[in-house]
Curated annotation (Swiss-Prot):
<dbReference type="Pfam" id="PF01344">
    <property type="entry name" value="Kelch_1"/>
</dbReference>
<dbReference type="InterPro" id="IPR000210">
    <property type="entry name" value="BTB/POZ_dom"/>
</dbReference>
<dbReference type="InterPro" id="IPR006652">
    <property type="entry name" value="Kelch_1"/>
</dbReference>
<dbReference type="InterPro" id="IPR011705">
    <property type="entry name" value="BACK"/>
</dbReference>
<comment type="similarity">
    <text>Belongs to the orthopoxvirus OPG047 family.</text>
</comment>
<dbReference type="Pfam" id="PF07707">
    <property type="entry name" value="BACK"/>
</dbReference>
<dbReference type="Pfam" id="PF00651">
    <property type="entry name" value="BTB"/>
</dbReference>
<feature type="domain" description="BTB">
    <location>
        <begin position="10"/>
        <end position="90"/>
    </location>
</feature>
<keyword id="KW-0880">Kelch repeat</keyword>
<keyword id="KW-0677">Repeat</keyword>
<dbReference type="InterPro" id="IPR015915">
    <property type="entry name" value="Kelch-typ_b-propeller"/>
</dbReference>
<feature type="domain" description="BACK">
    <location>
        <begin position="125"/>
        <end position="218"/>
    </location>
</feature>
<feature type="repeat" description="Kelch 3">
    <location>
        <begin position="361"/>
        <end position="404"/>
    </location>
</feature>
<feature type="repeat" description="Kelch 5">
    <location>
        <begin position="444"/>
        <end position="476"/>
    </location>
</feature>
<dbReference type="InterPro" id="IPR011333">
    <property type="entry name" value="SKP1/BTB/POZ_sf"/>
</dbReference>
<feature type="repeat" description="Kelch 1">
    <location>
        <begin position="269"/>
        <end position="315"/>
    </location>
</feature>
<feature type="repeat" description="Kelch 2">
    <location>
        <begin position="316"/>
        <end position="359"/>
    </location>
</feature>
């Protein structure tokens, strides 16, 4: 056990030992101890007050007092008063700190604080944070607050039953709060709203609404029972800052950074996932709200990805295949702590076409230029299954659900009907394409972009559901 010595105090101990000794029995929590009250009263004002001699007719030299201190901490303080030495380790330091604060023994107070700060541990958090607030120990409070903020995902369940409004506010408003995104704070509150009481005000005081997803904003409106959310222009928290993004940065610059990324969208939010950055495949992702013109943080994926595909389903965002792990799949959505690995694909696939019908995810193509296999994953299932094969291979095609049918279009075109579990051929596009996109505009299915024989296709085609064919779109 480490020993700490107060050399200045040690010089005075010899003189104190020559003084008249008065014995006092101290009843503490967990036991009692007989002390030389003369020495102990010299230690601090607390002991001078609580060990005051109560003379009787018999002038009894032994008195008895009761102190609200645990016997182990009191024993350490008594030993220090006799020797100038205090014994501190990780097991006794927190209780000893509280006892030394109550007894006003400054050397032990600052020695305990320095010991705690040098090797701060999770088990110190609650007591140290409460002592920091209660006794105004700013360095202990600041260090503990930052520790809790940085380890928030590990400590969130431990602190909720111990901290009051002020304690939670200091933590949740911190730049150091380690959360994957701002939606996580809202989700954390909703899960505990029955316990939090007046912490409803925290939502207004600590949430950085400019980094919330639309779902997070709607949750705030629901919590506050309002139709318009408060304005916020705070900087992002350190945990979800992107080291390669300067602040502020416009949306076009952010999009340029995510070169060769996978993209998909949910409503007005476009998700940019993986790609090529600094001459390597990376695992970063970001969301861009093109209506409010702000970016929304996404935690890094478990795997770097290039030539992957993304699809929203089951209130989650799924990322499928791509290099360097072409069978891997993972999912995430705003408010989740991290991406979750999902069952692997049955075949390795890069740039596969993906779509979702009734929360069933379908994956087509991306394996080889001759492959016609398809796979699907049912909600809450732990294994992909092969579906009906397509008529044509769709190595670089795209997919979209339109009118309850799953359209698969590239150099060739066909659609899948879930009710009959069959594919149906339709006319090929007028201009065959690799890596095009299907979009819906004014209830019309449009085919845009793509390449063919190294040339970009700038003609837009519209699907005619009466003739099962494609026409050049005139914008009407």
């Amino acid at each position: 056990m480490p020993i700490f010595v107060n050399t200045v105090y040690c010089k005075n101990i010899l003189a104190l030992s020559m003084t008249k000794k008065f014995k006092t029995i101290i009843d503490a929590i967990g036991g009692n101890i007989i002390v030389n009250s003369t020495i102990l009263k010299k230690l601090s004002p607390y002991f001078r007050t609580h060990l005051r001699q109560k003379y009787t007719k018999n002038k009894d030299p032994v008195t008895r007092v009761c102190l609200d201190l645990d016997i182990h901490s009191l024993t350490s303080i008594v030993i220090y008063s006799y020797t100038g030495k205090v014994y501190i380790d990780s097991h006794n330091v927190v209780n000893l700190l509280r006892a030394s604060i109550l007894t006003s023994v400054e050397f032990i107070i600052y020695t305990c604080i320095n010991f705690i700060l040098r090797d701060f541990r999770k088990e110190y958090c609650v007591e140290c944070y409460m002592m920091g607030i209660e006794y105004g120990l700013s360095n202990l409070l600041c260090h503990t607050k930052n520790f809790i903020a940085k380890h928030f995902l590990e400590l969130e369940d431990d602190i909720i039953d111990n901290f009051d409004y002020l304690s939670m506010k200091l933590i949740l408003e911190s730049d150091e709060l380690n959360v994957p995104d701002e939606d996580f704070v809202i989700k954390w509150y909703i899960k505990r709203r029955n316990k939090l009481g007046n912490l409803l005000l925290l939502i207004k005081n600590v949430i950085r609404s400019n980094y919330l997803s639309p779902r997070g904003i709607n949750n705030v409106k629901w919590i506050l029972d309002c139709t318009k959310i408060f304005h916020c222009d705070k900087q992002p928290r350190k945990s979800y800052k992107y080291p390669f993004i300067e602040y502020p940065m416009n949306m076009d610059q952010i999009i340029d950074i995510f070169h060769m990324c996978t993209s998909t969208h949910v409503g007005e939010v476009v998700y940019l996932i993986g790609g090529w950055m600094n001459n390597e495949i990376h695992n970063n992702a970001i969301a861009v709200n093109y209506i409010s013109n702000n970016w929304i943080p996404i935690p890094p994926m478990n795997s770097p990805r290039l030539y992957a595909s993304g699809i929203p389903a089951n209130n989650k965002l799924y990322v499928v295949g791509g290099l360097p792990n072409p069978t891997s799949v993972e999912r995430w959505f705003h408010g989740d702590a991290a991406w979750v690995n999902m069952p692997s694909l049955l075949k390795p696939r890069c740039n596969p076409a993906v779509a979702s019908i009734n929360n069933v995810i379908y994956v087509m193509g991306g394996h080889s230029e001759t492959d016609t296999t398809t796979e699907y994953l049912l909600p809450n299932h732990d294994q992909w299954q092969f579906g009906p094969s397509t008529y044509y291979p769709h190595y670089k095609s795209c997919a979209l659900v339109f009118g309850r049918r799953l359209f698969l279009v590239g150099r060739n075109a066909e659609f899948y009907c879930e009710s009959s579990n069959t594919w149906t051929l339709i006319d090929d596009p007028i201009y065959p394409r690799d890596n095009p996109e299907l979009i819906i505009v004014d209830n019309k299915l449009l085919l845009i972009g793509g390449f063919y024989r190294e040339s970009y296709i700038d003609t837009i085609e519209v699907y005619n559901h009466h003739t099962y064919s494609w026409n050049i779109w005139d914008g009407k």
